């Protein structure tokens, strides 16, 4: 068996509740540099062990708009062998994908033995958007959650490692980052109408995120919050 450690700023056991969660205490700059250098070398070593033991690893980065999901993935993959991972950014589903079962397009991203797949937003984001749009509620929501739990259990029961990270920022920080992106011609396209709506209705979105994380937090695939 491979022994692995999850590195993140804040880790809790059990159910992760954003409303009761507080940011982790930040180490000083020099300590952060030492940790970063140690992590860089350990990531490559870990990847080689995963390849040797033929362990497939699915890593989901979810969270708020402008929280830095893509940037975080970029920092991770910078230090590992590109032959043994892929990154998938999941945009809105196509017409064909809408006609398929909800999890169909995510199933296509499942990694091979000994490889990583990094998902820049996955089935959490799509589910949360549908809830916020009023398209998914009541029994339909419960069925969706059960299908997600079953899917994740099938993966872990069959030897996959499923890691789920939630990128957390507060309302003011999100607004600050969006304003910075909007101030430059080469980055303003990254802020969508939904991103602005999310910041305006931050509390409502937080409640939906909170419920989803509670409903999908399992011992075999728990949530990890990164601030």
What is the meaning of each model-derived region?
Residues 6, 13-227:
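Glycine-rich phosphate-binding loop of ATP-dependent small-molecule kinases
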